[in-house]
Amino acid sequence: MIRKVANYYAGVGGNRVLWGDEVHVTAIEYDEEIAAVYAALWPNDEVVVADAHQHMLEHLNEFDLIWSSPPCQSHSQIRYNLGYVANRHSQSKVKPLYPDLRLYEEILLLQHYCETKWVVENTIPYYQPLIAGKKVAGHIWWSNFEISPIQTVNRGHRNGTITSLQERKGIDLSKFKIGNKRQILRNCVEPEVGLHVLECAKNNPILGK
């Protein structure tokens, strides 16, 4: 039974919009300003301001479900293809980034040490993933339970405004004085996808057991 969920790299809680209060959520977020927004939006959740990568290592088997959404910018095929390749001969091209390999560190840690259910979510990368994952709803997933396909509407990330993204993600940031709201909203998992994955975790057994 899924009662306690760790929400790593929680941001403002896009993945948990439709979870309700049937699970106890511990949100781990490094950025104090973002964590304060999360706490205001989801007052019944426990919010921990900490390095999610280290917190996971130290609290690995304290939850029924671990959800991790590590930073995706260094892996993003959109950033690479539209920001770098398409502007290769332009001054406006984005700078190269080392892929943040903490993503794969966490997958390996969870695969070999986690005794409960877990899922890692990220953007579909511009390279062949170093560990094979499953593409569902415009994301790539690694988990120890089956995640079934789900149909979603267009995510609206490329041209979405703050207003349209707030409506799409089910999160209103209008009363918060924080910067880069558009990027924060773009980083949010779609609410119906977050609920779908939680339901898959509840209803599907750990693979191989």
For each feature predicted by the language model, list its residue ranges.
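Conserved active-site and SAM-binding loop architecture
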Residues: 1-209
